[in-house]
From Swiss-Prot:
The keyword Protein biosynthesis applies. Belongs to the GatB/GatE family. GatB subfamily. PROSITE patterns: GATB. Allows the formation of correctly charged Asn-tRNA(Asn) or Gln-tRNA(Gln) through the transamidation of misacylated Asp-tRNA(Asn) or Glu-tRNA(Gln) in organisms which lack either or both of asparaginyl-tRNA or glutaminyl-tRNA synthetases. The reaction takes place in the presence of glutamine and ATP through an activated phospho-Asp-tRNA(Asn) or phospho-Glu-tRNA(Gln). It is an enzyme of class 6 (ligase). Heterotrimer of A, B and C subunits. This is Aspartyl/glutamyl-tRNA(Asn/Gln) amidotransferase subunit B.
């Protein structure tokens, strides 16, 4: 029997506001344990939450970017559960009226086809703290993360393979990152993924019993965990077994999933409206204000790069991998840079430099202005392509004018025959054995002179001009 795979994803995205959702504590990552906390985060008696408007702004932007309807009257709810990293014993979240609902995004698969994935809802909530279980037998609670604003994006169960789930996450991350509401760094916990997967016989309408997957700390592990579950569940069903509703975690070392707990039924969180927060009205003016702040998204930029700038689909995809890179490219082209040349540099030397340095394009000194200037002085023959690599490294580390650096460092390419011909004659005088080999007709003897000339000019001879002049002067030797 063959089975159809059914996948839905729940993605938690931390919003990059300066302060937390209901308290003035800093929401920044990486501080000492409990440094970013106050009496609200610790749930002291009598304290009340105060809404951070920037969180609603971010929620509206996310909803618009994901083609969602927006609840014009929005409220928060209490989700009741006890855990040490949740001192209130409830989480402030949204239940029946999330900020966004009924959305969709389009994904692109490896074969080039596209598919629309529906999004059920996106709701705002506060993050919980973090428990650390020490080797000394004690557990430690860090509430820095408590109250950091989240938006949870819940897809419909529209994905039919691990490949589609991977493509959905890739597209979702791109879109969220372009809005500017989150840096979506999985390694820092600002993007977290839970997956729900079930199998059903082809032709059956009813979903099978789902398994929830956690501990998915990369898109690659999401894919691997889902692939493992497809095989595990199919094997179990074919042998006459039944799938239990359970939560499993992906174990990277064993390349498989491990049981965490069995779910006897749906959890009862006893949701009820949060009495300490008002109803929030989101009018059209507010929505329009947030819409005006949104950029052009990756899909639209890729289409523009292919149709208007003549780039390949691959180049367009690489250039839109991050908003910062895409913005850099667009600025460079607007300054007169050739689109293909700028693209080649960004995907070649620039990408290699960033990987080697472990930095992003915003963190180096290179600017669109000095990259375009460098490309221009390659085109006009001021420097060679080989010399340009040295110039680029200087610009990436120090910035400044490409032309000014080339002139100051004495890197200007020598193209004047009046300068090169005397140097060629000196090369002949300094290499009599090579001249003798050439005159005697020794095979490939002429090629040695190119290296001699480049050495004599410290690599500054224009290769094309040098080859032409060498051929002329060598012919004179032969005559």
């Amino acid at each position: 029997m063959n089975f159809e795979t059914i996948i839905g994803l729940e993605v938690h995205v931390e919003l990059n506001t300066n302060s937390k959702i209901f308290s003035p504590s800093s929401a920044h990552f990486g501080e000492d344990p409990n440094a970013n906390t106050n009496v609200i985060d610790w749930s002291f008696p009598g304290v009340l939450p105060v809404m951070n408007k920037g969180v609603i702004d971010a929620g509206i932007k996310a909803a618009l970017a994901l083609n969602m309807d927006i609840h014009k009257e929005m409220h928060f709810d209490r989700k009741n559960y006890f855990y040490p990293d949740n001192p209130k014993a409830y989480q402030i979240s949204q239940f029946d009226e999330p900020i966004g609902y009924n959305g969709w995004i389009e994904i692109k698969l490896e074969d080039g086809s596209t598919k629309k994935i529906r999004i059920e809802r996106a709701h705002l909530e506060e993050d919980a703290g973090k428990n650390t279980h020490g080797t000394d037998g004690y557990s430690y609670v860090d509430l820095n993360r408590q109250g950091v604003p989240l938006i949870e994006i819940v897809s419909e169960a529209d994905m039919r393979s691990p490949e589609e789930a991977y493509a959905y996450l890739t597209a979702l991350k791109e879109i969220i990152q372009y809005t500017g509401i989150s840096d979506v760094k999985m390694e820092e916990g600002s993007m977290r993924v839970d997956a729900n997967i079930s199998l059903r016989p082809y032709g059956q309408e009813q979903f099978g019993t789902k398994t929830e997957l956690k501990n998915l700390n990369s898109f690659s592990n999401v894919r691997k965990g889902l692939e493992f579950e497809v095989e595990r569940q199919a094997k179990l069903l074919r042998s006459g077994g039944a799938i239990r509703q359970e939560t499993r975690r992906y174990d990277e070392a064993n390349k498989g999933t491990i049981l965490m707990r069995v779910k006897e039924g749906a959890a009862d969180y006893r949701y009820f409206p949060e009495p300490d927060l008002p109803l929030y009205e989101i009018d059209d003016a507010w929505i329009d204000e947030m819409r005006a702040q949104l950029p052009q998204f990756p899909a639209q930029r890729r289409a523009k790069y292919e149709e208007e700038l003549g780039l390949s689909a691959y180049d367009a995809s690489q250039l839109t991998a991050t908003k910062a890179l895409s913005d850099f490219f667009e600025t460079a082209v607007s300054l007169g840079g050739d689109a293909k040349q700028v693209s080649n540099w960004l995907q070649g030397e620039v990408a290699q430099f960033l990987n080697a340095e472990g930095k992003t394009i915003e963190e180096i000194a290179l600017t669109p202005e000095n990259l375009v200037e460098m490309i221009a002085i390659i085109a006009d023959g001021t420097i060679s392509s080989k010399m340009a690599k040295k110039v680029f490294v200087h610009l990436a580390k120090n910035g400044g004018s490409a032309r000014a650096y080339v002139e100051k460092a004495g890197l200007v390419q020598i193209s004047d025959p009046a300068v090169l011909v005397p140097i060629i004659h000196q090369v002949f005088a300094d290499n009599e054995a090579a001249v003798a080999d050439f005159k005697s007709g020794k095979r490939n003897a002429d090629k040695a002179f190119t290296g001699f000339l480049m050495k004599a000019t410290k690599g500054q001879a224009n290769p094309q001009v040098a080859q032409q002049l060498l051929a002329q002067e060598l012919q004179k030797l032969r005559d």
